[in-house]
């Protein structure tokens, strides 16, 4: 329960939308206005971006997060963004409603332990080649440290196909629901 009648896991469709990365104020303002007009109450966007290439844009950082939070708060939209390091949790805490653990950090056990000691929901994305059991184990790291507000995310896995980045494993969704009481979301 994120407050303001926003819930995940209550059987209703919860839409979380937004850009891959938070780049500038104009982008955020336009996206916030569009999402709000559609009735979407949760916006995701990366301010720290783990990239395959060291030359790619790696995010707008804490300043981008502050701007992102300011725009979303004014519109009553909750914020989801990726945390990549334990040290970032305290910096980000007041601006984030849901901490996201991305695929590249799915097995970062120090980060999972630290997020387990917070009182904010944690969205766990399945690792790039992660198994269902590894995703559930990641959730256990958070859970065993006291935080039961965990959302599992099927985001696709790496396969031999190169036409698209990830292959969505829809079979994982009912299996995760069968093996766990935690809410499951899909990031196509």
How would you name each of these model-derived features?
Residues 1-16:
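N-terminal amphipathic alpha-helix/helix-capping segment at the start of soluble metabolic enzymes
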Residues 8, 118-188:
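Catalytic alpha/beta core domains of metabolic enzymes, predominantly
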Residues 11-13, 39-41, 73-79, 95-97, ...:
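Short, well-ordered coil/turn segments that N-cap beta-strands
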Residues 13-30, 54-59, 78-82, 102-103, ...:
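Active-site mouth loops of central-metabolism enzymes
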Residues 18, 35, 43, 92, ...:
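Conserved, mostly hydrophobic/aromatic
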Residues 44-63:
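Glycine-rich, proline-tolerant flexible connector loops at the mouths of alpha/beta enzymes
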Residues 57-81, 114-121, 170-185:
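Alpha-helix-loop-beta-strand connector modules within alpha/beta enzyme cores
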Residues 58-60, 76-87, 97-109, 121-132, ...:
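Catalytic beta/alpha-barrel core
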